[in-house]
Curated annotation (Swiss-Prot):
PANTHER family: BAND 7 PROTEIN-RELATED, PODOCIN. It comes from Rattus norvegicus (Rat). Gene3D superfamilies: 6.10.250.2090, Band 7 domain. Residues 355-365 have a biased composition (Polar residues). Plays a role in the regulation of glomerular permeability, acting probably as a linker between the plasma membrane and the cytoskeleton. Its main location: membrane. This is Podocin. The gene is Nphs2.
Length: 383
């Protein structure tokens, strides 16, 4: 009996140990899965971060402005974008590094300057004015950083070359060029453009002939903008047109490191045939206005004369005063003229038959019977 009880207890103990071992294995497997899941989540986070950084690197760093869409000069957004673009490229310039041979040359030149220090320092320092900036090229490579100045700057005489850029306001006259208006008139326009160098590094590294580039750009921009305006608008709205041209130019020249301050239309030259036709039209309009004014004056004068005649007809004393005033004016204007005044009553008598003849209307009277010439004579019985 004891042996049977011991065997049964051993069996139950073995079963319990097996079940506990199985539970331990399951818990370890679950922990392992959790541990595996955690690195997977970390890997996903890392991959997401990498994709985000890649997208940030792939994102464009520059804003592109289409000049053809700049039509309304009152848009302030275009000017703001142009200002931002003009400040960005100077920081974004990345000059290429020097090679091994170039570094050896730089070190040797520095050693030579140090050895001959008291005398060489005068050849390595230059002065830049307040309105100037200096760009240094070392062995053909643009040195990193902003333009030097104002004040002193150091350079290597044998390896460096420097270029000075004037930041003061520049003036450029645009010669006469043909423009076709909206109403198909051909005219010649000249203008003047005021600009300044804003980014010296970008200017020297991107543009060769500043004046020619700005001149051609102003001409093409004016042709494009004035094609949407009539002749009358061009002659009357020069200020708004100049503002439109300035905004359009500034959106392009910001990439070159140039800031356009102002543009003005100086003169508009019309062809001879168009000038003659416009002069004839203007003269006809002036003649029409003169005729209208003369007709209105005659109408007002006739109305005033009619009113004066009505007033004088009601007051005989006023007629006499007018008669005396006329005599006095005749004597003063022409002293050699002798005037014999007649009494006013005689004038009334002389004028009354004429007034009656003019005022009376002779109506046709009824026909009277014709009497024979010899009424006493009788006709013969034969007749």
């Amino acid at each position: 009996m004891d042996s049977r009880a011991r065997s049964s207890s051993r069996k139950t103990h073995g079963r319990g140990s097996r079940s506990s071992s199985r539970d331990d294995k399951k818990s370890k497997a679950g922990r392992g899965n959790r541990g595996r899941a955690r690195p997977d989540a970390g890997a996903e986070r890392q991959s997401a971060g990498r994709t985000g950084t890649r997208e940030e690197h792939r994102a464009p760093a520059a804003t592109v402005v289409n000049v053809d869409e700049v039509r309304s000069p009152g848009e302030e957004g275009t000017e703001v974008v142009a200002l931002l673009e003009s400040e960005r490229p100077e920081e974004g310039i990345k000059p290429s590094g020097l090679g091994a041979c170039e570094w050896l040359l730089v070190l040797s030149s520095l050693i030579f300057i140090i050895v001959t220090f008291p005398f060489s320092i005068w050849f390595c320092i230059k002065v830049v004015q307040e309105y100037e900036r200096v760009i240094i090229f070392r062995l053909g490579h643009l040195l990193p950083g902003r333009a030097k100045g104002p004040g002193l700057f150091f350079f290597l005489p044998c390896l460096d070359t420097y270029h000075k850029v004037d930041l003061r306001l520049q003036t450029l006259e645009i010669p006469f060029h043909e423009v076709v208006t909206k109403d198909m008139f051909i005219m010649e326009i000249d203008a003047v453009c005021y600009y300044r160098m804003e980014n010296a590094s970008l200017l020297l590294s991107s543009l060769a002939h500043v004046s020619k580039a700005i001149q051609f750009l102003v001409q093409t921009t004016m042709k494009r903008l004035l094609a949407h305006r009539s002749l009358t608008e061009i002659l009357l709205e020069r200020k708004s047109i100049a503002q439109d041209v300035k905004v359009a130019l500034d959106s392009v020249t910001c990439v070159w490191g140039i800031k356009v301050e102002r543009t003005e239309i100086k003169d508009v030259r019309l062809p001879a045939g168009l000038q003659h036709s416009l002069a004839v039209e203007a003269e006809a309009q002036r003649q029409a206005k003169v005729r209208v004014i003369a007709a209105e004056g005659e109408k007002a004068a006739s109305e005033s004369l009619r009113m004066a005649a009505e007033i004088l007809s009601g007051t005989p004393a006023a007629v006499q005063l007018r008669y005396l005033h006329t005599l006095q004016s005749l004597s003063t204007d022409k002293p050699s003229t002798v005037v014999l005044p007649l009494p006013f009553d005689m004038l009334n008598l002389l004028s009354s038959p004429s007034n009656r003849a003019q005022g009376s209307i002779n109506y046709p009277s009824s026909p009277k019977p014709v009497e024979p010439l010899n009424p006493k004579r009788k006709d013969s019985p034969m007749l």
